[in-house]
């Protein structure tokens, strides 16, 4: 499954809002025409652009994002998690976008629990 991205200069708010709603996500990485990560956009801000009939996303691209190389170890990723509510994006040495680090993967890695055990813990917390 290829990671979904916002292509700067090619896609406007309408297309991105549809993409995000289809996948039930609220943030997308933004890449330039060469596939280089330039930032991220948030659904709330895209909805505002659409309301204002602005077709270009450049004004809402958040350029200060956390990104790591694919071979970064978990111990080096965890401190980043304390600084952001956004995903941590994975890039190569040229900053070409490759994917993201899902929070659930980090939790599984750190706790040693599998997805099923984590879901059980969550369910128990909901039922309390």
Please give the residue ranges for each predicted region.
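A diffuse structural propensity rather than consistent per-protein peaks
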Residues: 12, 42, 56-57, 102
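A broad, low-specificity signal for short, low-complexity segments enriched in glycine/proline
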Residues: 26-30, 48-51
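The conserved cystathionine-beta-synthase
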Residues: 5-25, 31-34, 67-94, 103-115, ...
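Solvent-exposed, flexible loop/coil residues
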Residues: 50, 64, 72
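Short hydrophobic beta-strand motif reused across regulatory alpha/beta modules
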Residues: 38-46, 98-106
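Short C-terminal domain-edge/linker segments immediately following a structured domain
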Residues: 60-61, 71, 91, 97-99, ...
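Bateman (tandem CBS) regulatory domains
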Residues: 1-5, 53-65, 121-128
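A short, polar/charged loop-to-alpha-helix boundary motif
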Residues: 44-59, 106-120
């Amino acid at each position: 499954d290829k990671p979904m991205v916002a292509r700067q200069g090619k896609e406007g708010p309408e297309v991105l809002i549809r993409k995000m709603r289809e996948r039930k996500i609220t943030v997308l990485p933004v890449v330039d025409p060469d596939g280089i990560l330039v930032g991220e956009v948030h659904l709330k801000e895209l909805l505002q652009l659409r309301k204002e009939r602005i077709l270009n996303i450049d004004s809402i691209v958040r350029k200060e994002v956390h990104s790591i190389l694919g071979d970064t170890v978990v111990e080096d990723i965890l401190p980043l998690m304390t600084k952001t509510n956004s995903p941590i994006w994975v890039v190569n040495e040229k900053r070409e976008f490759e994917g993201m680090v899902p929070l659930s993967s980090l939790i599984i890695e750190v706790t040693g629990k599998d997805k099923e055990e984590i879901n059980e813990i969550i369910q128990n917390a909901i039922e309390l």
